[in-house]
Amino acid sequence: IYEKDYLKTALDAIHKAKHPLIFCSDYFEVRDGKRVTSNKLLQIKRIMLLPMRIKAFQSVRWVRRRILSMGSPICCPSVTFVTENLPKVVFENHYRACEDWEAWEKLSKKKGEFLYSTKLLMGHRIHEESETTAAIGDNKRSREEYEMFCKFWPKFIAKFIFKFYSKGQNSNQL
């Protein structure tokens, strides 16, 4: 569910940027038809994205990769792609629950900017039929998340971070 200012905010940011790769915004959850603007998971994601509030950091690969090394705070439906600055294939499609995180990891290596707005510009529906919920149910999400952490960290550190990160899976329950 996109707010009326989403497109204007995205286009304004993209037009002001030197070499934008993606634009993303903060978001709210929609649970049982109700707008949820704050919960533990949203607060953690907002903290993770704090460095992206600083425009100078939006183009720094090291900063983007450090953020992503701790998890995936970018809500996929909030993303607008600047396709002329991206590879033809953004999503590899070999992950079921982490294909967006894998895409951000790949794009984070590229020269350009990850533009971020702190405005709540879209609502993400949380429901029991989602692919995320299904992937949690069959443990596929856990395996994929651990693999993603291993792209940034040695296995023993990835395992340690994953123990804390996996607690966020509970937030997908209604």
Question: What residues fall within each predicted segment?
Answer:
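Alpha-helix C-cap/termination motif
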Residues: 16-17, 110, 151-152
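Alpha-helical elements of Rossmann-like donor-binding domains used by nucleotide-donor carbohydrate transfer enzymes
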Residues: 1, 5, 9-13, 102-106, ...
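C-terminal, non-catalytic tails of nucleotide-sugar-dependent glycosyltransferases
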Residues: 50-62, 113-114, 137-174
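Conserved nucleotide-sugar donor-binding catalytic segment
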Residues: 25, 43-141
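Short, solvent-exposed polar/charged micro-motifs at secondary-structure junctions
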Residues: 32-35, 126, 168-173
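Conserved protein kinase catalytic core
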Residues: 3, 32, 131-133
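Conserved donor NDP-sugar-binding/catalytic core segment of glycosyltransferases
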Residues: 5-44
